[in-house]
């Protein structure tokens, strides 16, 4: 059950872990392995000029939970995100970040509005088609969501087994993606034998092994030390440079301010700011 509690986190040798992350980030094979979208379409302006359709289109999206009928979790959201963009989603807890991300893979169905993801209308898609939609979306979470009784290799392989990939493809792609995130020597380790940063790298590998064009991350560095958080974010940035669209919900002010990427700020279910090369803004960490 992928929703089981996260495995215990072992203490890490931070210097060694940072070094292994650096080695992964300097791997020249990233571009050859992860290239689902033309990197030239990596900026919103260029994509629009080229007539490229958004990979995510949200029009007048509202979500009202029955328990809070007078307080929409999302209220008239209008967003376009283009292939190859890297977007931060910021705001207080309860501002709507997680609900917004959950609508993108149909974990949550909006009350009203329209959502297109990779050209598919999520308000009209049949339930039996949802698993096919999710194959185009990688997901990374704060608590890793690794299967505790499976090794790093088995956790990543499981993502391919679930969509019926042949054994030969699994034997080829899983070691490759683990090598690319700097875990070639940890393939046989169980989650409780890995540090938090290593567990998150397994989660990133699992999310990317099917080479989806879209990666959504909900607080991916929330439980990690600053140095390891920086490495994970650089890993996501490296994946983004190959063309993958990356959306990251985070409370990490310093990270957002240092990376100068597009920032969408939510408050009370509303988009209150959508800024190219933006900063975190005046939001607390609660």
Go through each PLM region and give its residues.
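Conserved ABC ATPase signature
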Residues: 190-194, 198-200
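ABC ATPase NBD coupling module
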Residues: 122-138, 241, 283
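Short coil-to-helix segment of the ABC ATPase nucleotide-binding domain corresponding to the Q-loop/switch region
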Residues: 150-158
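Helix-to-loop junction immediately C-terminal to a conserved catalytic motif
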Residues: 105
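Conserved ABC transporter NBD signature motif
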Residues: 113-121
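Conserved signature/switch motifs of ABC ATPase nucleotide-binding domains
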Residues: 189-192, 210, 242
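Catalytic Walker B motif of ABC-type/P-loop ATPase nucleotide-binding domains
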Residues: 215-218
């Amino acid at each position: 059950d992928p929703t089981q509690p996260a495995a215990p986190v072992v203490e890490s040798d931070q210097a060694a872990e940072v070094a292994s992350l650096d080695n992964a980030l300097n791997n020249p094979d990233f571009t050859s392995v992860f290239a689902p979208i033309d990197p030239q379409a990596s900026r919103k302006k260029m994509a629009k000029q080229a007539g490229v359709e958004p990979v995510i289109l949200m029009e007048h999206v509202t979500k009202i939970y029955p328990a809070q009928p007078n307080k929409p979790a999302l209220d008239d959201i209008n967003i376009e995100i283009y292939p190859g963009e890297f977007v931060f989603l910021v705001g207080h807890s309860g501002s709507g970040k997680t609900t917004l991300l959950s609508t993108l893979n149909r974990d949550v169905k909006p009350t009203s509005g329209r959502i297109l993801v990779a050209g598919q209308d999520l308000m009209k898609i049949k339930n039996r088609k949802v698993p096919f939609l999710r194959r185009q979306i990688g997901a990374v979470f704060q608590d890793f969501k690794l299967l505790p009784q499976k090794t790093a290799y088995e956790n990543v392989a499981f993502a391919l087994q679930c969509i019926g990939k042949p054994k030969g493809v699994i034997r080829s792609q899983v070691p490759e993606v683990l090598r690319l995130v700097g875990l070639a020597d940890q393939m046989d380790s169980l989650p409780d034998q890995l540090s938090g940063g290593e567990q998150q790298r397994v989660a990133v590998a699992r999310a990317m092994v099917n080479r989806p064009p879209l990666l959504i991350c909900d607080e991916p560095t929330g439980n990690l030390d600053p140095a390891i958080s920086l490495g994970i974010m650089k890993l996501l940035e490296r994946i983004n440079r190959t063309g993958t669209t990356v959306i990251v919900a985070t409370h990490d002010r310093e990270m957002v301010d240092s990376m100068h990427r597009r920032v969408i700020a939510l408050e009370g279910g509303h988009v209150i700011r959508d800024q190219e090369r933006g900063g975190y803004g005046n939001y607390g960490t609660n």
